[in-house]
Regions:
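N-terminal Rossmann/SDR dinucleotide-binding element
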Residues: 2-38, 236
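Conserved residues in the N-terminal Rossmann fold of short-chain dehydrogenase/reductase
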Residues: 20-21, 63, 154, 217
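Conserved sequence/active-site signature of Rossmann-fold short-chain dehydrogenase/reductase
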Residues: 25, 92, 129-131
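Conserved Rossmann-fold NAD(P)-dependent oxidoreductase catalytic core, especially the SDR/UDP-sugar
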Residues: 48-107, 112-114
Length: 325
């Protein structure tokens, strides 16, 4: 907050900026702020976003991400906000971790709220934002600078990437296009192999992979899946005026059902002494598309191995075919 405020004041000295410290979990504080300033637009970006940390502290993901989003969405409705944009993630699609499941629940919260409010609620799904805090590129650069190793969790792991200008553009375009209930998705091109990204960054530094800088495969972390997705199978895509921004057609979940799931989670997090198995069971009730990473990754690896066998067999058959004279 301190650095953001300094930067904004330096760039826009005539802009009226109010920096306010608070938590989305503190509804009374939120109501005081909304009551005083009556925001016309709300961009809701507050969230715990790191997958491994939320696997260790799953109840915090529910409290901050889900219940915090409900609090802000309620205040936007109560105090007459015109438009509310939720920052979501591709990890919300068929989630394999608590963080992704919590963000999918956030999408459901704002879509349910949109059905009963004059405020227009929409969401944008981000991929990995290049150069942002906690992203893989600054980490790799730091590891290269320190002489390695560069750590990659799996040789086949891929991710969708977007630049900071693309991310900002997606949010602003979503704000102008939103009519209420949409989930906006950016065409980010083909997913990038993280291993290939590590190799490229080492070479761009004038060094040789596995000669000057070793690449270490560390193993998938809890909740981490090999491939991210932009859409659930039930969602379709609609075009917008922008040729790289699309709208995922919303799934029709009754608002009453979503509210019931939120209250179930709210009641569940009142006590802390839950096992991980109990937590995942409740999260699966709230987010039926949640599948544990180990199960998802096993299916992907098996499918890939089957494809490789088929390709090898086809090549062998091709080699055995009689050559034309």
């Amino acid at each position: 907050m301190y650095n953001i405020e300094l930067e904004l004041r330096a760039k826009y000295p005539n802009l009226n900026i109010k920096g306010i410290i608070g938590s989305v979990r503190d509804k009374k504080k939120l109501e005081d702020v909304f009551s005083k300033y009556k925001p016309y637009l709300v961009f809701h970006a507050a969230a715990h976003k790191h997958v491994p940390l939320m696997e260790v502290s799953p109840l915090e993901a529910i409290k901050n991400n889900v219940l915090g989003t409900q609090n802000v969405a309620d205040c936007a409705d109560k105090f007459g906000t015109k438009r509310f944009i939720l920052i979501s993630t591709d990890k919300a699609v068929n989630p394999t971790n608590i963080m992704g499941a919590s963000k999918r629940m956030c999408e459901m919260v704002i879509q349910a709220k949109n059905k009963t409010s004059k405020t227009e609620y929409a969401a944008v799904r981000f991929g990995n934002v290049l150069g942002s805090n906690g992203s893989v590129v600054p980490l790799f650069k730091k590891q290269i600078k320190e002489g390695g190793p560069v750590t990659v969790t799996h040789k086949d792991i891929t991710r969708f990437f977007m630049t900071i200008p693309e991310a900002v553009g997606l949010v602003l375009q979503a704000m102008t296009y939103a009519k209420g209930g949409e989930v906006f998705v950016l065409d980010m091109g083909e997913p990038v192999k993280i291993y290939d990204l590590a190799v490229s960054l080492i070479k761009l530094s004038g060094l040789q992979p596995d000669i000057d800088i070793p690449i270490e495969i560390t193993g998938l972390r809890p909740g981490e899946k090999l491939y991210e997705e932009l859409l659930m199978s039930e969602e379709g895509l609609e075009h917008t005026k922008h040729n790289k921004i699309f709208v995922a057609e919303p799934l029709d979940i009754p608002a009453e059902e979503v509210n019931k799931r939120v209250e179930m989670l709210r009641e569940f997090v009142q006590t802390e002494n839950h096992t991980m198995e109990e937590i995942k069971k409740v999260v699966k009730k709230a987010v039926p598309t949640f599948v544990e990473a180990e199960e998802k990754n096993k299916k992907i690896i098996n499918y890939k191995q089957e494809l490789e066998k088929i390709e090898a067999r086809q090549m062998q058959e091709h080699e055995l075919m009689p050559k034309e004279a």
